[in-house]
Swiss-Prot record:
One of its GO terms (cellular component) is cytosolic small ribosomal subunit. Part of the 30S ribosomal subunit. Forms a tight complex with proteins S10 and S14. The lineage of its organism: Bacteria, Bacillati, Bacillota, Bacilli, Bacillales. This is Small ribosomal subunit protein uS3. Gene3D superfamilies: 3.30.300.20, Ribosomal protein S3, C-terminal domain. PANTHER family: 30S/40S RIBOSOMAL PROTEIN S3 (PTHR11760), SMALL RIBOSOMAL SUBUNIT PROTEIN US3C (PTHR11760:SF19). Belongs to the universal ribosomal protein uS3 family. GO terms for molecular function: mRNA binding; rRNA binding; structural constituent of ribosome. The gene is rpsC. The keyword rRNA-binding applies.
Length: 217
């Protein structure tokens, strides 16, 4: 089971939290679709800003958005000009008051989405699929990853028959629920068609904190 399921979804509620932190009864469907529009809009607007993921919180008529990015300067802009433009566009998109918080990702080479998108971008520039995977693995291990696995699938090198090739280093314990495993997939549009990129990065175990109030202590 651990080999097939999305490692992030499997660990939600155990060592990972939801990326949408709100609850609604009647308006759930409309708010969910609004979330999807917000995420798609941010992805399109900040395509070059190395955005890893977006967290959304709601309170009354206010939306708090946390953007995790490897290039915070590009998101904020000179004197906050770019983030102000983004905030105004999101205000118009949602008809609500939007607050944006930009969080910098310091180690971009052990963030699965940024690694996957970097591999996809290099594949679009006709780089060797073997070399880009090995370079990504090397950089991640140097930054302290416990293990990494990458896979590229499709018409590799323009071959007539599609196939998948994967490389790994270290351990990636997909069945261990306390293992902090980051996963992402990306697509590369090449002249021979689409190539799929998958990345799993194991960053160590997240140990549960002991509850000191147990046993009447």
């Amino acid at each position: 089971m651990g080999q097939k399921i999305n490692p992030i979804g499997l660990r939600v509620g155990i060592i990972r939290d939801w990326e949408a932190k709100w609850y609604a009864e009647k308006d759930f469907a409309s708010l969910l679709h609004e979330d999807l529009r917000i995420r798609k809009f941010i992805d399109n607007e900040l395509k070059e800003a190395s955005v890893s993921h977006v967290e959304i919180e709601r309170a009354a008529n206010r939306i708090n958005i946390a953007i995790h990015t490897g290039k915070p300067g590009m998101v904020i802009g000179k004197g906050g000009s770019e983030i102000e433009k983004l905030r105004n566009k999101l205000n118009n998109l949602t008809d609500k008051k939007v607050h944006i918080n930009v969080i910098e990702i310091k180690k971009i080479d052990i963030d699965a989405r940024l690694v996957a998108e970097n591999i996809a971008r290099q594949l679009e520039n006709r780089a060797s699929f073997r070399r880009v995977q090995k370079q990504a693995i090397s950089r991640a291990m140097k930054l302290g990853a416990k293990g990494i696995k990458t896979q590229v699938s499709g018409r590799l090198g323009g071959a007539d028959i599609a196939r998948a090739e994967q490389y790994s280093e270290g351990t990636v314990p997909l069945h261990t629920l306390r293992a902090d495993i980051d996963y992402a997939h990306a697509e590369a549009d090449t002249t021979y068609g689409k190539l799929g990129v998958k990345v799993w990065i194991y960053r160590g175990e997240v140990l549960p904190t002991k509850n000191t109030s147990e046993g009447g202590k």
